């Protein structure tokens, strides 16, 4: 394996014999460290597990570092944590790519400077201004925008599987995908204080639900003593019961040691900045985790004290979620050892809304909500 020099970081400011183009670690791609072109982002991975992984396999499936936590949890036979953004890559690694769950491939990076003008790079990529960069993969295609000063700036769209040098921008032929990429780029992230970006106050679009929706949230009950809130979508054992509840509730009959997943939509009444709050029962071991779209909304898992109220802010720093009016997919995971004494309360605060419990009328579900 050739030595790796972090994408060939440019060393023009160095005095000496360094030549960042010597190894051409960017390969057949353009870009170096700090670029969001493929040459600055893509990292090859070698995996060896003779007992499970067939030798000689090559996979071009894109993944990110967060997928490896999920993968190693899967290998160890423990639940993939809900607070992990990743999905297990074990199906792909073991030759069952048809069973691979889709994951989130997303990145943003703000750094001054520009792509160097290496002779191997395409003319239109040489000298490209970096600034605020953002990438997102949707339907196997990569969206990339650089020098972003407006959250509505269009993505360049590339088929990196067949065009790793990103020579052909497909954006003009894919307006519908452009809109989905913009939505995905906002709905899978949270503002990261103290860093500030132009995306932080951009309104996350509501979803256009196909078909009718029905009142309440779907629930699924999983028996087990869970050490943390799992991503139940990746839990191998089936639910022991399921149904619909008018509002967030985990008081289902079954084993005292259980996990409950609630899925559906929450209807945001008005465009603006919202803060959410969650409280569980006070029973030992009670934990919860909430996602809105793909973003982490509330973490009442790590270091959580049962019965305490946790908000969607970052500790004592305000960090509201900016949402468009309409339906937004919500996923709530809960684990506890308290049976029907379990409790879950979800509140909100926003435009024209003082802090109060979210009414049952705001929750709904569709056929695809589970």
Model-found features: residue ranges?
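Active-site-proximal N-terminal segment of extracellular/periplasmic enzymes that hydrolyze or transfer
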Residues: 168-176
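Beta-strand elements within well-structured catalytic alpha/beta cores of enzymes
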Residues: 1-4, 44-46, 68-73, 158, ...
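Short glycine- and hydrophobic/aromatic-rich loop-to-beta-strand nucleating segment
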Residues: 45-48, 63
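Acidic glycine-/aspartate-rich tracts in secreted/extracellular proteins
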Residues: 53, 162, 336-338
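C-terminal cap/loop subdomain of S1 sulfatases and analogous C-terminal strand-loop tails that border
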Residues: 8-38, 53-57, 66-156, 160, ...
């Amino acid at each position: 394996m050739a030595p790796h020099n972090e994408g060939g970081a440019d060393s023009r400011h160095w005095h000496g014999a360094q030549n960042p183009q010597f190894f051409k670690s960017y390969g057949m791609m353009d870009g170096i460290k700090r670029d969001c072109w493929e040459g600055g982002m893509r990292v090859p991975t070698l995996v060896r597990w003779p007992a499970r992984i067939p030798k000689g396999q090559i996979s071009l499936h894109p993944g990110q570092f967060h997928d490896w936590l999920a993968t190693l949890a899967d290998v160890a036979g423990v639940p993939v944590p809900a607070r992990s953004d990743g999905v297990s890559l074990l199906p792909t690694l073991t030759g069952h790519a048809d069973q691979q769950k889709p994951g989130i491939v997303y990145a943003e990076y703000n750094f001054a400077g520009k792509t160097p003008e290496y002779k191997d790079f395409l003319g239109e990529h040489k000298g490209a201004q970096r600034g605020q960069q953002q990438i997102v993969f949707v339907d196997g295609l990569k969206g990339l925008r650089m020098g972003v000063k407006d959250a509505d700036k269009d993505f360049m769209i590339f088929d990196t599987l067949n065009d790793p040098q990103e020579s052909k921008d497909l954006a003009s032929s894919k307006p519908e995908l452009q809109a989905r990429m913009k939505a995905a780029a906002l709905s899978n992230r949270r503002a990261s204080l103290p860093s500030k970006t132009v995306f932080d106050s951009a309104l996350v679009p509501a979803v256009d639900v196909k078909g009718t929706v029905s009142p309440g949230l779907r629930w699924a009950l999983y028996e087990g003593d869970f050490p943390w809130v799992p991503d139940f979508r990746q839990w191998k054992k089936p639910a022991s019961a399921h149904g619909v509840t008018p509002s967030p509730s985990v008081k289902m009959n079954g084993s005292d040691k259980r996990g409950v997943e609630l899925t559906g939509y929450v209807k945001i009444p008005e465009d603006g900045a919202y803060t959410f709050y969650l409280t569980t029962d006070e029973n030992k071991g009670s934990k919860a985790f909430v996602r809105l779209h793909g973003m982490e909304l509330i973490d009442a898992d790590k270091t959580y004290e049962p019965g305490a109220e946790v908000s969607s802010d970052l500790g004592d720093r305000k960090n509201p979620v900016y949402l468009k009016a309409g339906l937004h997919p919500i996923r709530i995971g809960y684990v506890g050892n308290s049976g029907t004494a379990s409790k879950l309360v979800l509140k909100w605060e926003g435009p024209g809304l003082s802090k109060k419990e979210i009414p049952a009328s705001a929750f709904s579900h569709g056929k695809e909500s589970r």
